[in-house]
């Protein structure tokens, strides 16, 4: 047997009477019974008798709410042609036929989504035995196509229902059902659109490890959330944010690692910068005074005697504080704790990572220094070697005038004064520095022009010098 469809809803509402449900003994003598049903299409008497004998059996079976369609008969004619009763034998051929009204009934019945045949194996009204969360992605796309077909069939059914000329007496309830079904289909259309958008969002995802897009079947929880309607946009935003964070996680870890290294390297430099810029006046003043006193002592005494005296001074200060705390404890005015306990509790050990970083830094500095010395003294570049020779020649005159400690003292004074002066007079200093660099570039160009083998470099140097002067 074919598919079973519920029709004739008006038969359930109206009571079964002799006029609506004819007796089996009366046969087809009553012309008023189902007058509209047998005038939809023209069929021959043989087709009508054959259809009636195969499908109906007796006219009393019209009172049932379900009609069984045979697969052979259903494929041969329309659905509404089966429900007609045979015409009475006494009807003349010349009698005019009523206008075809059953077509409007059939179309209105087809317009109801619960009564229309679906091209898919199951009807739309039937509950889905498998939850959408457990379906694969292809089955969800098939469901979207089915919803689109239902919307199109509902729209065609509404057009045919409005175009019918002679409605039945209980066509108004069918129209209400059709309108309700139309609202349901509109809701399902919006649901299908939102589901399509969520599938497009969730399907092309990036792999956190490789960063390439991969096809991904939505998880059950995501599929269940996608069926709740367009109000799940915050969920999509959360999912997108989650995957965005997963994509940035390796980069973030790398940045954190590099940040740790930079902090480990820049922390001493920041302390030195604070001292040189006199951010804390007391600390910078104390450091500057201590350095100048030590250097001045080294001018008159040997380095060994200066180091020994400084060490004794420090020990006298610390021992005096320690004895003072013990005396306070003896007279019951203190707890006798070490005044330097906070410094003693400081962890000065280096972790394995810090040790490796320090060793790598020291090794890199040693290797770079050795490479530079080899470059200068083994004359890898003649110009660079000549520059170094000129620098040492100038230092011979400086050494004849100044002592080494004097140069160190001048350097310390410059370190604690030049940064402040440069901050206050930055524009003027930059202007004078630019003039000096231009003069030096001209001098270098002249020297390179006179040295054999380096004449080709002179035009480029002169061009760069002219550009700098123009600026």
From Swiss-Prot:
<dbReference type="InterPro" id="IPR003388">
    <property type="entry name" value="Reticulon"/>
</dbReference>
<feature type="compositionally biased region" description="Polar residues">
    <location>
        <begin position="100"/>
        <end position="118"/>
    </location>
</feature>
<feature type="region of interest" description="Disordered">
    <location>
        <begin position="153"/>
        <end position="181"/>
    </location>
</feature>
<dbReference type="Pfam" id="PF02453">
    <property type="entry name" value="Reticulon"/>
</dbReference>
<keyword id="KW-0206">Cytoskeleton</keyword>
<dbReference type="GO" id="GO:0046324">
    <property type="term" value="P:regulation of D-glucose import"/>
</dbReference>
<comment type="function">
    <text>Inhibits amyloid precursor protein processing, probably by blocking BACE1 activity. Enhances trafficking of the glutamate transporter SLC1A1/EAAC1 from the endoplasmic reticulum to the cell surface. Plays a role in the translocation of SLC2A4/GLUT4 from intracellular membranes to the cell membrane which facilitates the uptake of glucose into the cell.</text>
</comment>
<keyword id="KW-0812">Transmembrane</keyword>
<feature type="compositionally biased region" description="Acidic residues">
    <location>
        <begin position="169"/>
        <end position="181"/>
    </location>
</feature>
<dbReference type="GO" id="GO:0010467">
    <property type="term" value="P:gene expression"/>
</dbReference>
<feature type="modified residue" description="Phosphoserine">
    <location>
        <position position="228"/>
    </location>
</feature>
<keyword id="KW-1133">Transmembrane helix</keyword>
<feature type="region of interest" description="Disordered">
    <location>
        <begin position="205"/>
        <end position="234"/>
    </location>
</feature>
<keyword id="KW-0256">Endoplasmic reticulum</keyword>
<feature type="domain" description="Reticulon">
    <location>
        <begin position="272"/>
        <end position="471"/>
    </location>
</feature>
<dbReference type="GO" id="GO:1902430">
    <property type="term" value="P:negative regulation of amyloid-beta formation"/>
</dbReference>
<dbReference type="InterPro" id="IPR046964">
    <property type="entry name" value="RTN1-4"/>
</dbReference>
<dbReference type="GO" id="GO:0014802">
    <property type="term" value="C:terminal cisterna"/>
</dbReference>
<feature type="modified residue" description="Phosphoserine">
    <location>
        <position position="226"/>
    </location>
</feature>
<feature type="transmembrane region" description="Helical">
    <location>
        <begin position="295"/>
        <end position="315"/>
    </location>
</feature>
<keyword id="KW-0703">Sarcoplasmic reticulum</keyword>
<dbReference type="GO" id="GO:0030018">
    <property type="term" value="C:Z disc"/>
</dbReference>
<dbReference type="GO" id="GO:0005882">
    <property type="term" value="C:intermediate filament"/>
</dbReference>
<protein>
    <recommendedName>
        <fullName>Reticulon-2</fullName>
    </recommendedName>
</protein>
<dbReference type="GO" id="GO:0009986">
    <property type="term" value="C:cell surface"/>
</dbReference>
<keyword id="KW-0472">Membrane</keyword>
<feature type="transmembrane region" description="Helical">
    <location>
        <begin position="390"/>
        <end position="410"/>
    </location>
</feature>
<feature type="compositionally biased region" description="Polar residues">
    <location>
        <begin position="159"/>
        <end position="168"/>
    </location>
</feature>
<keyword id="KW-0963">Cytoplasm</keyword>
<dbReference type="GO" id="GO:0015031">
    <property type="term" value="P:protein transport"/>
</dbReference>
<keyword id="KW-0597">Phosphoprotein</keyword>
<dbReference type="GO" id="GO:0065002">
    <property type="term" value="P:intracellular protein transmembrane transport"/>
</dbReference>
<feature type="region of interest" description="Disordered">
    <location>
        <begin position="1"/>
        <end position="137"/>
    </location>
</feature>
<comment type="subunit">
    <text>Interacts with SPAST. Interacts with BACE1. Interacts (via first transmembrane domain) with ARL6IP5/GTRAP3-18. Interacts (via N-terminus) with SLC1A1/EAAC1; the interaction promotes cell surface expression of SLC1A1.</text>
</comment>
<dbReference type="GO" id="GO:0030315">
    <property type="term" value="C:T-tubule"/>
</dbReference>
<dbReference type="GO" id="GO:0033017">
    <property type="term" value="C:sarcoplasmic reticulum membrane"/>
</dbReference>
<feature type="compositionally biased region" description="Basic and acidic residues">
    <location>
        <begin position="32"/>
        <end position="43"/>
    </location>
</feature>
<feature type="compositionally biased region" description="Low complexity">
    <location>
        <begin position="14"/>
        <end position="25"/>
    </location>
</feature>
<feature type="compositionally biased region" description="Polar residues">
    <location>
        <begin position="205"/>
        <end position="229"/>
    </location>
</feature>
<keyword id="KW-1003">Cell membrane</keyword>
<feature type="modified residue" description="Phosphoserine">
    <location>
        <position position="44"/>
    </location>
</feature>
């Amino acid at each position: 047997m074919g598919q079973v469809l519920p029709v004739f809803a008006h038969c359930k509402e109206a009571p079964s009477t002799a006029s609506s449900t004819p007796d089996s003994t009366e046969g087809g003598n009553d012309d008023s019974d189902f007058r509209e049903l047998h005038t939809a299409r023209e069929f021959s008497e043989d087709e009508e008798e054959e259809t009636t004998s195969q499908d109906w059996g007796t006219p009393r079976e019209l009172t049932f709410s379900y009609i069984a369609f045979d697969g052979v008969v259903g494929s041969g004619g329309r659905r509404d042609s089966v429900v007609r009763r045979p015409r009475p034998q006494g009807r003349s051929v010349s009698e005019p036929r009523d206008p075809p009204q059953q077509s409007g009934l059939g179309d209105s019945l087809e317009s109801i989504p619960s009564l229309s045949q679906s091209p898919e194996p199951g009807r739309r009204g039937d509950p889905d035995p498998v939850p959408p969360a457990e379906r694969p992605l292809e089955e969800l796309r098939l469901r979207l196509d089915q919803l689109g077909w239902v919307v199109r069939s509902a729209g065609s059914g509404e057009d045919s229902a409005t175009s019918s000329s002679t409605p039945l007496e209980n066509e108004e309830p069918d129209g209400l059902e059709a309108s309700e079904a139309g609202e349901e289909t509109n809701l399902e259309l919006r649901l299908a659109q939102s589901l399509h958008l969520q599938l497009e969002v969730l399907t092309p995802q990036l792999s956190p490890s490789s960063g390439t897009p991969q096809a991904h079947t939505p998880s059950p929880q995501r599929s269940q959330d996608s069926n709740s309607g367009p109000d799940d946009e915050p969920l999509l935003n959360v999912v997108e944010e989650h995957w965005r964070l997963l994509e940035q996680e390796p980069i973030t870890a790398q940045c954190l690692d590099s940040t740790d290294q930079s902090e480990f390297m820049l922390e001493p430099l920041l302390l030195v910068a604070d001292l040189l810029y006199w951010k804390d006046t007391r600390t910078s003043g104390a450091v500057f005074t201590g350095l100048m006193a030590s250097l001045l002592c080294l001018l008159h005494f040997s380095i060994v005697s200066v180091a020994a005296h400084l060490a004794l001074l420090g020990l006298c200060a610390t021992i005096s504080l320690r004895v003072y705390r013990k005396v306070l404890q003896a007279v019951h005015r203190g707890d006798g704790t070490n005044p330097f306990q906070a410094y003693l509790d400081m962890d000065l050990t280096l972790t394995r990572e810090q040790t490796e970083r320090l060793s790598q830094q020291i090794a890199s500095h040693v290797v770079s220094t050795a490479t530079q010395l080899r470059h200068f003294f083994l004359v890898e570049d003649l110009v660079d070697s000549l520059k170094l020779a000129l620098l040492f020649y100038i230092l011979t005159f400086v050494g004849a005038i100044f002592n080494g400690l004097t140069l160190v003292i001048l350097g310390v004074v410059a370190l604690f004064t030049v940064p402040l002066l440069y901050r206050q007079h930055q524009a003027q200093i930059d202007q004078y520095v630019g003039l000096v660099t231009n003069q030096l570039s001209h001098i270098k160009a002249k020297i390179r022009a006179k040295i054999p083998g380096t004449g080709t470099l002179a035009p480029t140097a002169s061009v760069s010098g002219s550009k700098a002067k123009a600026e």
